């Protein structure tokens, strides 16, 4: 049914040269007096951004500690169609499918946020964040536990998106998809390696045995990715299952570098440094892009790898610092470089829908790169202007504040934060009566009246950040408009790190651009 159509995933957009009006420059240069006076409760937003993941859980829920109490067990037999155990993990968005590619990216970004900014989190929230990482990595370890294959998806998205039903009720096919030597998927395998390696750093101190298991899994997944090169969506069967939702539009090469970069960061082993140095040009490290997300990792690779050069540890990685600088310059309106689009209200904008994924992921890179630069007193030269860490921090803060309510709509785009936020998000479990209050089954088509209802969702998915407004800063609270009203795990995952930074640095101060 058209009205129940699945989210149309985002194609890569190219950098465009745009003129930014003076009012936008002023908006980015300093917060408004009202915003500065009011401020935001970053601690509350952080807690809720992590809580969101408990509403996305698949599988048997914990007997104690499940705070999204309106959810119940679901998909407990996942993997049965292939004779394996694939219970667990996360539903990617407002549907009931487990897509391995974006789930692994979600885990990577959650882990990276804890690695970089976990010290700024209150202890309870750091523990919740680690739990969110573990829920994903426990599942990812299952996907790589059978020799010769990696399982990359559970659920038939076409059939799933034809129904509006709770995950606890779903009866659509739980088709299992895998990659192998015969049908490679370096993209998913490489991202899985990155996720497991990054997560190993989260648990290194508190659970070294689990951390070692994660790192071993990361090595195995990376070896698979590098030995069997190819994009999973090039295979007709896998393409039918994953596309148009999560096709690999940008190729698998970036995920190979991304996986190697995270294995280098986590293990410090020279093997992975050699891989990065020897294969960077071949695998497109110098690709110029101002995008970072589940499909395109180039900007993230350059920021991550540049750390060793910035810290003075590996001077041969200078080119990655140069590439990272180039990415940063595309975000600075005053720069003469071709740069990203900002809405009149100051939001980073890229066409295609679910725009907040770009806002949160780019904001995370801004803060992470600012941290690296600050540690070595470096700046970024953008030709006609020079920018320092404070400018990057202020720009990221503006984006976070936009999400939390400093925007033309005067509303928060995080469910449960502030006085005004989305009430009708595109999310099956949130929009249907809870299994706890309505234990009777709600079948596939029986959920349609709830989809069409103008009433607020009965189960607020606290912490969910929706796709957000378009280039005109306008947001209609419309469940049917999935491009704007649907939350995803990969919107929230980078935001956790952003908010953690802001908890520790509630007022980053004014950034100054030197001409």
UniProtKB/Swiss-Prot annotation:
Top-rank EC class of the record's enzyme: hydrolase
Catalyzed chemical reaction(s): Endohydrolysis of (1->4)-beta-D-glucosidic linkages in cellulose, lichenin and cereal beta-D-glucans
Keyword vocabulary terms for this entry: Carbohydrate metabolism, Cell wall biogenesis/degradation, Cellulose degradation, Glycoprotein, Glycosidase, Hydrolase, Polysaccharide degradation, Secreted, Signal
Active site (catalytic residues): 95, 426, 477, 486
MF GO annotations: cellulase activity
Subcellular location: Secreted
Glycosylation: residue positions: 178, 375, 384, 452
GO CC annotations on file: extracellular region
Signal found in the keyword field: yes
InterPro entries in UniProt: 6-hairpin_glycosidase_sf, 6hp_glycosidase-like_sf, Glyco_hydro_9, Glyco_hydro_9_Asp/Glu_AS, Glyco_hydro_9_His_AS
Signal peptide: 1-29
Enzyme Commission numbers on file: 3.2.1.4
GO biological process terms held by the UniProt record: cell wall organization; cellulose catabolic process
Family: Belongs to the glycosyl hydrolase 9 (cellulase E) family.
Name recorded for this polypeptide: Endoglucanase 23
Source organism: Oryza sativa subsp. japonica
Gene this chain is encoded by: GLU12
């Amino acid at each position: 049914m058209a009205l129940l159509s699945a989210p149309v995933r985002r194609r890569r957009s190219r950098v465009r040269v745009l003129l930014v009006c003076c009012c936008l420059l002023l908006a980015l240069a300093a917060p408004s007096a009202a915003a500065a006076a009011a401020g935001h409760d970053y601690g509350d937003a952080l807690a809720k951004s992590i809580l969101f993941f408990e509403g996305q859980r698949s599988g048997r829920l914990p007997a104690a500690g499940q705070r999204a109490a309106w959810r119940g067990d679901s998909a407990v037999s996942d993997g049965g169609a292939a004779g394996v155990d694939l219970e667990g993990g996360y539903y990617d968005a407002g549907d009931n499918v487990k897509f391995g590619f974006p789930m692994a990216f979600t885990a990577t970004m959650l882990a990276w946020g804890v690695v970089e900014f976990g010290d700024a989190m209150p202890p309870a929230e750091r523990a919740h964040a680690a739990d969110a990482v573990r829920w994903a990595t426990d599942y990812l370890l299952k996907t790589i536990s059978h020799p010769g294959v990696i399982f990359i998806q559970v659920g038939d998205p076409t059939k799933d998106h034809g129904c509006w039903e709770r995950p606890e009720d779903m009866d659509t096919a739980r088709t299992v998809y895998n990659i192998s030597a015969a049908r490679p998927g370096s993209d998913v395998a490489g991202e899985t390696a990155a996720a497991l390696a990054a997560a190993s750093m989260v648990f290194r101190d508190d659970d070294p045995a689990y951390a070692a298991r994660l790192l071993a899994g990361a090595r195995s997944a990376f070896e698979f990715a590098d030995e069997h090169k190819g994009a999973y969506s090039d295979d007709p069967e896998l393409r039918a299952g994953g596309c148009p939702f999560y096709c690999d539009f940008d190729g698998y090469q970036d995920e190979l570098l991304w996986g190697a970069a995270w294995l280098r960061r986590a293990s410090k082993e020279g093997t992975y440094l050699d891989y990065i140095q020897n294969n960077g040009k071949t695998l497109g490290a110098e690709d110029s892009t101002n995008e970072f997300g589940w499909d395109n990792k180039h900007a993230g690779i350059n920021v991550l790898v540049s750390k060793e050069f910035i810290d003075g540890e590996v001077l041969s990685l200078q080119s990655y610092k140069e590439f990272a600088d180039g990415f940063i310059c595309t975000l600075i309106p005053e720069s003469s470089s071709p740069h990203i689009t900002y809405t009149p209200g100051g939001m980073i904008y890229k066409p295609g829908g679910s725009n907040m994924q770009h806002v949160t992921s780019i904001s995370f890179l801004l803060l992470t790169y600012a941290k690296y630069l600050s540690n070595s007193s470096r700046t970024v030269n953008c030709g006609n202007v020079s920018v320092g860490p404070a400018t990057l921090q202020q720009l990221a803060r503006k984006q976070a504040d936009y999400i939390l309510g400093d925007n033309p709509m005067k509303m928060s785009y995080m469910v449960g934060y502030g006085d005004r936020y989305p009430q009708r998000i595109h999310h099956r479990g949130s929009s249907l009566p809870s299994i706890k209050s309505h234990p009777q089954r709600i079948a596939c088509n029986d959920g349609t009246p709830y989809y069409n209802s103008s009433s607020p969702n009965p189960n607020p998915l606290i912490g969910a950040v929706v796709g957000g407004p378009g280039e005109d800063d306008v947001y209609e609270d419309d469940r049917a408009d999935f491009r704007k009203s649907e939350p995803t795990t990969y919107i929230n995952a980078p935001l956790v790190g952003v908010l953690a930074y802001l908890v520790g640095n509630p007022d980053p101060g004014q950034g100054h651009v030197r001409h």
